[in-house]
Regions:
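Short coil/turn linking the two alpha-helices of tandem helical-hairpin repeats
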Residues: 57-59, 91, 110-113, 124-130, ...
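Residue-level recognition of tetratricopeptide repeat
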Residues: 43, 78, 112-115, 148-149
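Single conserved hydrophobic/aromatic residue that forms the stacking wall/gate
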Residues: 1-12
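TPR alpha-solenoid repeat register
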Residues: 46, 81, 115-118, 152
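Structural register within alpha-helical repeat arrays
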Residues: 49-54, 68, 85, 121-122, ...
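TPR/TPR-like (Sel1-like) alpha-helical repeat modules
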Residues: 6, 143-144, 172-189
């Protein structure tokens, strides 16, 4: 067992050196971890490690990241696993399921900065689904979790700007752009 564990230690050291070398990119990590994730889809320790590496390398839009998140969610439906599954659905254009998993992650998460990012991602999914009032609500949630968070203000500006003719009164419709400018100025200020 000691020989076997040392062998694994060497494997992990080599992987760490490869990742830190700067040679590793999302495509190579997809090729390396894709088969390993499939082979280890019930091994939560391996899946956590793979997810951490993929996040560290900013490969959280790769198929292997989505698969690992999906398998991890089946074993242990944590907030992080739910977020991975939510992003998978978001990328596929299934915004209703994306919102469902983002909501679940929001309910489980305790860190307000992460909650802010999840609420913002939910707002973006709702905007894509053309559910503008709900998207606005999630932008406000994101801002309540993290005061100096500019992205929700930018998304709010996009929401308001995407529907400038919300009334039959032309004068009021022109005011929409003042709201857009206000939100962009707030985003710049934070």
């Amino acid at each position: 067992d000691l020989v076997r564990s040392r062998g694994l230690g060497d494997v992990y050291k080599r992987q760490a050196m490869f990742i830190q070398s700067g040679v590793a990119d999302c495509e190579s990590l997809q090729n390396i971890y894709g088969p390993k994730v499939e082979a280890s889809k019930t091994d939560s320790a391996f899946l956590k490690k793979a997810l951490n590496i993929l996040k560290l390398m900013k490969c959280n839009e790769s198929e292997v990241y989505f698969k690992a998140s999906e398998y991890m969610y089946q074993i242990d439906p944590t907030a992080d696993a739910a977020v991975g599954v939510a992003y998978m659905y978001y990328k596929k254009g299934d915004y209703d399921n994306a919102v469902k998993y983002f909501d679940e992650a929001l309910a489980k998460e305790t860190d307000n900065d992460k909650k802010a990012e999840m609420a913002y991602a939910t707002a973006a999914a709702l905007m894509q689904a053309k559910k503008l009032s709900q998207a606005r609500s999630y932008c406000q949630k994101a801002m309540s979790f993290k005061e100096n968070y500019g992205e929700p203000y930018i998304l709010l500006a996009q929401l308001y700007g995407s529907n400038p003719n919300w009334t039959d009164e032309p004068a009021l419709n022109k005011c929409t752009y003042f709201v857009v400018i206000d939100k962009l100025q707030r985003a710049k200020a934070v």
